């Protein structure tokens, strides 16, 4: 799945096919790749319908080429499919923190218990593992081996067939020994299709242990079948979250991820390999960046981020025009950094007021002068203190000299920056409260 979509992105961005035809071909490739990854067909066609709708309704910002803009929309919509901005909270909310792992047989639950213990141990927590899976003969030995490998204590009773009794004793002992995080590996004797029995046992164990988190472990290879299991689990345990394992070994990982997200359950981690450290917190945007090929879309995402940051500065300017506060040099600094993210300065310099190059078509020499001025002003801003950026009025002649020395500039250049800043604040107060005036001030709309 990942390779197919990544190849489609590269082909789309570097190919010579006419734009409209290239878009149609890409959408078809995207649909095929997602469906072959076992993503629900309805979800796939809903996704591509949203992409097409945005293409028809929205206009690309001037800092993005049409193809770049299209890929940024694909990135947005795919991120929503896999969970959007939701960031799982993996930090314990109290100590000790009891985690109960549940999952059907073969889901990789015991291996995940070891990985989870290692994840928290690396972060400085004292971790204890409880082996309460009595139905799989090798479960205790496997957990003991993992515990020895990572230096984590394991409690288990190989001759006791009562999982609830073992879990209760193990938790009590680890609480007494002042463990920060206690992970209970519960029984996994039921297969897929036997969710009712699994959830009944989970409830029984939950009532005794009163854990702080219940995590359902799902094998990625079941694809969209994960929907039924995750849905029933989410209804039975609203505080619970999900770990999807074996993402590296199946083409159905996208199907499992999208299915779990569709239930409303939170995906906390994904397993990305067999090694003990191959467990990562799940982040939809990071996952989608990987799908699309981070090297191919990084510059596009950087431009979009710059555009978002620039919009924040524009809103701040609107507030200043309404008499709410004052533009600071920190705002100016943020504005310049945002513009730099949006592409070569030669393409965005005309949007910065007061540089004397706001012509319909600035000459190459004018652009070079402007770029150099921006670079030198940034050096000056980097040499100022936090207080000076917030209130430039405190900068006296002595500080001007120090700032100039620290940034390799002439004192006159620092003075010019401060004069430009003061002029800009005066301009903002004079301009009427209309978006058109702000755009005029900035040489035209960017977004």
Swiss-Prot record:
What SMART domains does this protein's entry cite?
AAA, SRP54, SRP54_N
One GO molecular-function annotation for this sequence? GTP binding
GO cellular component, as recorded:
signal recognition particle
Give the source's domain of life in one word: Archaea
Q: Name one GO biological process term.
A: SRP-dependent cotranslational protein targeting to membrane
Keyword vocabulary terms for this entry: Cytoplasm, GTP-binding, Hydrolase, Nucleotide-binding, Ribonucleoprotein, RNA-binding, Signal recognition particle
Pfam short name (any one): SRP54
Enzyme group, top EC level? hydrolase
This entry's Enzyme Commission designation comes to 3.6.5.4
Q: Which reaction does it catalyse?
A: GTP + H2O = GDP + phosphate + H(+)
Give the subcellular location.
Answer: Cytoplasm
Family named by the database record? Belongs to the GTP-binding SRP family. SRP54 subfamily.
* Function per UniProt: Involved in targeting and insertion of nascent membrane proteins into the cytoplasmic membrane. Binds to the hydrophobic signal sequence of the ribosome-nascent chain (RNC) as it emerges from the ribosomes. The SRP-RNC complex is then targeted to the cytoplasmic membrane where it interacts with the SRP receptor FtsY.
HAMAP family (alphabetical): SRP54 (MF_00306)
The domain comment in this protein's record states: Composed of three domains: the N-terminal N domain, which is responsible for interactions with the ribosome, the central G domain, which binds GTP, and the C-terminal M domain, which binds the RNA and the signal sequence of the RNC.
The family database entries (PANTHER family) matched by this protein are listed as: SIGNAL RECOGNITION PARTICLE 54K PROTEIN SRP54 (PTHR11564), SIGNAL RECOGNITION PARTICLE SUBUNIT SRP54 (PTHR11564:SF5)
What name does UniProt use for this protein? Signal recognition particle 54 kDa protein
Origin organism is Saccharolobus solfataricus (strain ATCC 35092 / DSM 1617 / JCM 11322 / P2)
């Amino acid at each position: 799945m990942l390779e197919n979509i990544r190849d489609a992105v590269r082909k789309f961005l570097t190919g010579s096919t006419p734009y409209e035809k290239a878009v149609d071909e890409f959408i078809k490739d995207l649909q095929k790749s997602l469906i072959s990854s076992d993503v629900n067909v309805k979800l796939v066609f809903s996704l591509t319908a949203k992409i097409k709708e945005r293409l028809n309704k929205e206009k690309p910002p001037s800092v993005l080429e049409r193809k770049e803009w299209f890929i940024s929309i694909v990135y947005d919509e795919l991120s929503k499919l896999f969970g959007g901005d939701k960031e799982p909270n993996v930090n314990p909310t109290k100590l000790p923190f009891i985690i109960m792992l549940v999952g059907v047989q073969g889901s990789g639950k015991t291996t995940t218990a070891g990985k989870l213990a290692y994840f928290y141990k690396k972060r400085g927590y004292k971790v204890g593992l409880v082996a309460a899976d009595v139905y799989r003969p090798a479960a205790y030995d496997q957990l003991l081996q993992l515990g020895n490998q990572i230096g984590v204590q394991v409690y288990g009773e190989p001759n006791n067939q009562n999982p609830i009794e073992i879990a209760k004793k193990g938790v009590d002992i680890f609480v007494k020994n002042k463990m920060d995080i206690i992970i209970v590996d519960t029984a996994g004797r039921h297969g897929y299709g036997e969710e009712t029995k699994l959830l009944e046992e989970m409830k029984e164990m939950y009532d005794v242990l009163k854990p702080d988190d219940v995590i359902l472990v799902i094998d990625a290879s079941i694809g969209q079948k994960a929907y039924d299991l995750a849905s029933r689990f989410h209804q039975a345990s609203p505080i619970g979250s999900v770990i999807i394992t074996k993402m590296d070994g199946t083409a159905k990982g996208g199907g499992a991820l999208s299915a779990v997200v569709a239930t409303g359950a939170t995906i906390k981690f994904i397993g990305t390999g067999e090694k003990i450290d191959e467990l990562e917190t799940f982040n939809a945007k990071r996952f989608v960046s990987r799908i699309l090929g981070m090297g191919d879309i990084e510059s596009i995402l950087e431009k979009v981020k710059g555009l978002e940051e620039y919009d924040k500065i524009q809103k701040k300017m609107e507030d200043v025009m309404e008499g709410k506060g004052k533009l600071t040099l920190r705002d100016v600094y943020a504005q310049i950094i945002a513009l730099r993210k949006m592409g070569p300065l030669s393409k965005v310099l005309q949007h910065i007021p007061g540089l004397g190059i706001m012509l319909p078509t600035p000459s190459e020499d004018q652009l070079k002068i402007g770029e150099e001025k921006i670079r030198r002003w940034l050096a000056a801003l980097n040499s100022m203190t936090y207080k000076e950026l917030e209130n430039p009025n405190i900068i006296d002649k002595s500080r001007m000299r120090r700032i100039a020395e620290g940034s390799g500039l002439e004192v006159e250049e620092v003075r010019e920056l401060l004069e430009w800043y003061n002029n800009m604040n005066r301009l903002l107060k004079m301009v009427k409260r209309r978006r058109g005036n702000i755009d005029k001030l900035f040489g035209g709309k960017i977004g």
